[in-house]
Amino acid sequence: MKLNPTVSALVIAAGMTMPTVMFGAAADLDSCCTPADKDQPKVGANLANQSYSSLNQISKANLNALGAAWMTRVSPVPATTPGPSAGTTDTGQQTTPVVVDGVIYLDTPNGGVIAVDGATGVAKWKWTPTVANTGFAPTGTRRGVSVGDGKVFTLAGGQRVVALDKNTGAQVWVSQPTGPAGASLGNIAKVATVYYDGMIYLGGNDGNRNAAFAVRSSDGALVWSFYGGAAPGVVVTDVNGVTIDAGATWGPLQANGLSCALTAGVSPWIHPSVDPELGMVYYTFGNVRSCGSSQDGSGRPGDNLWGNSVVAFDLKTGAYKWHFQSIRHDHWDMDNVHPPVLADVNIGGQSKKALYYGSKSAMTFVLDRTNGKSLLGVVEKARPLDSRQQSATTQKFPAQGMWFPECVVWEPLGTGNIPGSPWRGVPNYDGYQPNAVGQLVYTEPNYLDVDKPFVTYPAEYGSTHRLGCMYDDHWDLPVLSTTSQNGGPDWSNHGFSPRTNLYYVPYGINNVAHDRTEGGNGLRPIGQYQTGGVVAINASTNQVVWRNHFGLDVAHGQHPLITSSDLLFIGMPDGNFIAMDAVDGKELWRFQTGASISSGAVTYAIGGQQFVAILAAGTGIPYGNSITEGDLLWAFKLGGNFKTASGSSELPTPAPLALRRPVGNTAASALVPPNTVLLARSNGTATATADSTATGAMVPSTLTVPVGTTVTFLNPGPTTFATNPNLKAHCATQFFEGLFNPKLNPGESFQYTFTRAGEYFYNDCTDPRPTGKVVVVGVPQDLPGALQFVPGILSMRPANGVHTNVQGLATAMLKVPVGYTFDGNVQLKTPLSTTLFPAVTATMTSDGATLIATFDKALIDNNMPEGAAVPLVVTANFMNAGVQKQLSSTANVRVVK
């Protein structure tokens, strides 16, 4: 575990005093904005979705004493209800735990529910439905239960809502709610449930038509419902007296006489917020995907209500109150569904009942939650329009702007700028091609020239070609823009602290290329980095106060938890659970849980002691199969001293994440010569599609070679494929290092010798989608006996007795043969992890004979066991005779913990 040294010094000076934890809130919250306390009975902590707790025992002053109290693997726990059954080995879940009266409730990886004693980690009960014992199965992905009225509310297979006795897990009732005349309410499977005052508020996800709806907590009977796609004849009047013909916003009826609204999706797939004082519940509705696709708006002219809108309803009746649409006529699949955050804040010297409506488009609309009007101003911006898309002429932006750049950053290529701006664009998209010095310059002709007759540019856009900006229009060919359907905060909760008056947003960055032929999420260019962080926004001004861009995407369920001691806890896709200073965003504390985290933390108090808990279970978005799934429920407290099998409190570091979008899997064939790549072919056969624009149209997609290999890039002409040659010129534009950029006519080839290990992506200039990768590997040259650690005994004992506070450096010395020049990349391999750990410092002695490297004990202690002869391997790159070599040596070291 890594602790900020300044904080450590403060704590040591303060000693181990343990302040009394303050609490008092009941499980059934009675107001929107009362902070959660010893209980957090719903995802988002309170009815306002603030993800904030008034608990303050764990603070910046004693953070170095925060250690693991216990860890429970929830899947192997046997089920107790509705009938005894064995545990499972399932992993992976997006749920955030909730807690009431010291008991943690959460969805298990296989979709059941478990109750765990918050003090000990011992399971109290576990509910796992099966077709054999209940007549239905669980759902898979779940995002949270809620607790109230003595029950735990969850979802199950077959569009079921289930109530369980919170003390025993016994089924109280099961319902299958339907809409008017038995109509489907959508796919009832993922959305976290919200309980308030005898009602459960729910939403449909992923179906053709989805509704927000409420059922009674006593028996699951439907009380009201409201569909996201407004059918013909739906006319409403809001609290401001404005009448809207919502059904008319979908254009004319189809040839079959039906409205596009009836198959539009428009899912309320994230849990709502509730204001009991105003008697309103606030839902957000997502993207439109009917009459074409989510990337094609040509068949549904109009604003398409209630797509990408926040809508306020009467709590009891579901009567429409007001709405605010963030994106008109969405054909980018921006899917602005986020839990609305409510707060009472001072704006312009007056107390306002605010609603914060954030978005994947990286902007926050600050609204008056009594009437839906903007509190800080909205501007309408004209965007480039493709006449075929039936686009809205303007789109809404907060007057304060976005918290991301509005356009893609077209940074120059070069080895000195890796990885570069988080918002940098992959070359060749939108016509931005590298010039002779690697600058990305808009160049004609390019693949988007065919759109010119249909695209118009408003004067305020400042260009007559696409810049890669928010809401740039598209048609059949990919147009790269920011942000992304998988960027912004995606489904992560936001947070709010009344102490700091900051609104917190965990985000991801993943530029996306839109065209009508892409799937729902568009095309995230292969090879671009997938990163993210947390941004804090002044709740009174909507201005960014700080940003911590820590390089990992936290847009996918990694909800922040803020406490009244001004700490912000958040889980990471690499398994780390971190604490940040909520005032300035600095990281203060870090713990390795052993599995990817796609969940929010929860805090609670038992017997006057504060705990923080997190589920490390994992999800594949956006890092795919490189993530490590799990089923690990962790709890932390001051003085926690839980230890794993290695003798450390942390689990070993999971396998490294694939931070760049992966290439396809097109393999070579017998017709492809060794160390050769064929450009723009669907595969390596003579009958392949020539001049292919598929993403996998570099053959092979991945070519792995040793350092020093010369690779040939060939645009196959008649000599290679006599009856089916490529007819167009094609490029191999290497990015982001900019090592080469040949443009080859059919039959031409280019060679490049790779002298250093690494991953080298490249794509085509004729159409930017075909992308490949050359993986250059160093062949380790073993140096027996050349490595030693100083001193010979490696102590991993923490100074304060709490094992999460291991600090200091481990020093290694590697003897180097004559004629080798140091070339960097010093790494340590440990027995318990496949991750290689970088050196903190690495220097050569003045005679060039010895490499001295140091490694952070906080990163490596959990990745090695105790023992008298623990094998540790150091590798480093050196140049010899103009070729990079990887030297490696092993030392058996005594490790004590």
Region annotations inferred by a language model:
Residues 23-35, 659, 664-682, 779-810, ...:
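Boundary/junction segments of secreted and surface-exposed precursor proteins
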Residues 37-44, 88-112, 136-161, 185-212, ...:
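Repeat-blade elements of multi-bladed beta-propeller folds
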Residues 72-98, 126-146, 171-194, 225-271, ...:
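Extracytoplasmic beta-rich repeat domains
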Residues 117-120, 165-168, 216-219, 315-317, ...:
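Short loop/turn segments that connect beta-strands within beta-propeller blades
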Residues 507-511, 526-586:
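Loop/turn-rich, solvent-exposed surfaces of beta-rich toroidal or solenoidal domains
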Residues 602-657:
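Blade-level signature of beta-propeller repeat domains, shared across WD40, Kelch, NHL, RCC1
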Residues 659-780:
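Extracytoplasmic copper-binding redox domains, predominantly the cupredoxin/blue-copper superfamily
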